[in-house]
């Protein structure tokens, strides 16, 4: 089920990834490519473990990634 946090997360992650491909980014952070694709398409809610991995990689606050705070 798509919700506002999933949509905000997908938009923010796409922005942070820039020109990096899903394949490249998934390998860098150790998330299966298909799982990452589903996050970006708002087809799957992100796990806390993967959310932390992504936040750590980009050195970004989790609340910012989820759209609960502005950059």
Q: What do the predicted segments below correspond to?
A:
Residues 1-24, 28:
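A short, Lys/Arg-rich alpha-helix, primarily the initiator
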Residues 16, 48-49:
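Short, Lys/Arg-enriched C-terminal cap helix and immediately downstream tail that follows
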Residues 21, 32-35, 47, 61:
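Short coil turns linking two alpha-helices in DNA-binding domains
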Residues 42, 53, 71:
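Alpha-helical DNA-recognition elements
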Residues 49-64:
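DNA major-groove recognition helix of helix-turn-helix/homeodomain DNA-binding modules
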Residues 64-71:
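Short amphipathic recognition helices of helix-turn-helix/homeodomain-type DNA-binding modules
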């Amino acid at each position: 089920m798509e919700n506002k946090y999933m949509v905000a997360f997908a938009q923010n992650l796409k922005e942070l990834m820039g020109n990096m491909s899903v394949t490249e980014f998934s390998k860098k952070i150790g998330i299966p490519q298909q799982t990452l694709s589903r996050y970006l398409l708002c087809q799957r809610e992100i796990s806390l473990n993967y959310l932390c991995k992504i936040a750590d990689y980009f050195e970004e606050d989790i609340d910012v990634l989820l759209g609960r705070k502005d950059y």
